[in-house]
From Swiss-Prot:
Chain residues that bind Mg(2+) 2: D216, E388, E392
Keyword check for Amino-acid biosynthesis: yes
Pfam family, one: KARI_C
EC number: 1.1.1.86
Protein name per UniProt: Ketol-acid reductoisomerase (NADP(+))
Length: 490
């Protein structure tokens, strides 16, 4: 039973609204509450391994519990843990003595894993998640004596480790499941866990399981994964239709997302648009307005289906059906013309990605703003909406730069992958019709310089800079820069 749907209206609003930017003084106790405790991480994939490495470096006692057949077959999780000199054993051997059990297995495995863990966990132990799907959407019931918390780094596991090694961290969301906080220690343990992964150095949001799940699902389905996938396929097809070099076209898109979104990290949509000439900026702005208009109903449907639980219900049916839809979509994507395009070995200058990618920039702007706006309209706070619509975008774009959509879909969770395909199935025909009407200069070659109306340009600049995501983004990015400066100075 979907936990969110069991709440009354006021409870739903309070949970979705929960979001507080925590002060650095709140982490003065560091991770003292977890020192000399037995911490067992279940699963040793990207998040499991890299969070564990950080926590060990922070002075905590970390071991890994894996399934017996994973150990016997020496699978990748076992290799990850052993090669990094961690203690590894099965559930029966490690869970009964654990003070904190952190479940970092894939979403679809959570129910069966949690069922086993609950039978083995000692009284008053703490259970941790990094994504709340199992609690919120599946409605998992946890033993009342067990405290349930969440620490969710807002990036892939590899980035969690790399930022920690640089002496910094990644923005992190923490939460306590208030149905399971009988000893009132949840927040202190979550803070200590976030401190140990380095999250306190980049900024921590105190949120709720519900706010994390609903915003996370919306972001990954739309702008973070679904929009990038749809746009990659359609932009490549558009370039081929215009008789552009297939290898150049593929590289422009594959590396273009990463190059362009790098500007988002430093100055948001404003800086991304400022990288264009004035005439190109005006064109990108107008295209973005049109894209927002035609895609707004689809973004709204995804938000509505996430809030109602319809999305999760349909995806869990696919789990029961051996991932039939997911595997079919994965096969289709793997065999698209973009994924199988030839390699372009020449260098494309950085500015060329902007000058030849007006449409790509318009798609990014419209997708970020739509995703953010739909979350805000639903009651999700601006800080959460920013992290789930803009902040993670360069990290996802980086996966496409490595091995196109194959790499993105391999790195993201199965839940994100399913949602991405679902969005793309609907967005593809809508955007295809729109893109077919565009000018050649919108993608693949530079727009010739045109006369610019000063008043029009001024108004466009004002609208870009004054969008709510730019205002909250400026605040959050400045906070991260200050925290990084303090950390480096130490």
């Amino acid at each position: 039973m979907n936990y969110f749907n069991t709440l009354n209206f006021t409870q739903k609003i309070n949970q979705i609204n929960k979001c507080r930017f925590m002060k650095k003084e709140e982490f003065n106790k560091k991770n003292d509450i977890l020192k000399n405790k037995n911490i067992v991480i279940v699963g040793c994939g990207a998040q499991g391994l890299n969070q564990g490495l950080n926590m060990r470096d922070a002075g905590l006692n970390i071991s890994y519990a894996l399934k017996k057949n994973s150990i016997a077959n020496k699978n990748q999780s076992w290799i990850n843990a052993i090669e990094n000199n961690f203690k590894v054993d099965d559930y029966d051997a490690l869970i009964p003595d654990a003070d904190l059990v952190i479940n970092l297995t894939p979403d679809k495995q959570h129910h069966s894993v949690i069922k086993k863990l609950q039978k083995l966990m000692k009284k008053n132990a703490v259970l941790g998640y990094s994504h709340g799907f199992n609690i919120v959407e599946f409605g998992e019931k946890i033993r009342k004596d067990i405290t349930v918390i969440m620490v969710a780094p807002k990036c892939p596991g590899t980035e969690v480790r790399e930022e920690y090694k640089r002496g910094f961290g990644v923005p992190t969301l923490i939460a306590v499941h208030h149905e399971n906080d009988i000893n009132k220690i949840g927040l202190e343990v979550a803070k200590a866990w976030a401190f140990s992964t380095g999250g306190h150095r980049a900024g921590v949001l105190e949120s709720s399981f519900i706010a994390e799940v609903k915003s996370d699902l919306m972001g990954e389905q739309t702008i973070l994964c679904g929009m990038l996938q749809t746009a990659s396929l359609l932009c490549y097809e558009k370039l081929i239709t215009e008789k552009c070099n297939p290898a150049y076209s593929a590289k422009l898109i594959q590396n273009g997302w990463e190059t362009i979104t790098e500007s988002l990290k430093h100055g948001g949509i404003t800086l991304m648009m400022d990288r264009l000439s004035n005439s190109s900026k005006i064109r990108a702005y107008k295209l973005s307005k049109e894209i927002k208009k035609i895609l707004s109903p689809l973004f709204q449907k995804h938000m509505d289906d996430i809030i109602s639980g319809e999305f999760s219900n349909e995806m869990m049916k696919d789990w029961e059906n051996q991932d039939l839809k997911l595997l079919n979509w994965r096969y289709k994507t793997k065999n698209t013309s973009f994924e199988t395009a030839p390699v372009y070995n020449e260098k494309i200058p950085e500015q060329e990605y902007y000058d030849h990618g007006i449409l790509m920039i318009a798609i990014l702007k419209s997708g970020i703003e739509l995703s953010f706006e739909k979350m805000i309209e639903t009651g999700i706070k601006e800080e959460s909406a920013y992290y789930e619509s803009l902040h993670e975008l360069p990290l996802i774009a980086n996966t496409i730069a490595r091995k196109k959509l194959y790499e993105m879909n391999k790195v993201i969770s199965d839940t994100a992958e399913y949602g991405s395909y679902l969005f793309s199935e609907s967005a593809y025909p809508i955007l295809k019709e729109f893109i077919s009407t565009l000018n050649k200069s919108d993608l693949g070659c530079a727009l010739s310089h045109q006369s610019v109306n000063n008043i029009e340009l001024y108004r466009i600049n004002q609208k870009i800079q004054n969008h709510p995501i730019e205002i909250i983004g400026c605040t959050l990015r400045n906070y991260m820069k200050k925290m990084k400066a303090i950390t480096v100075a130490k």
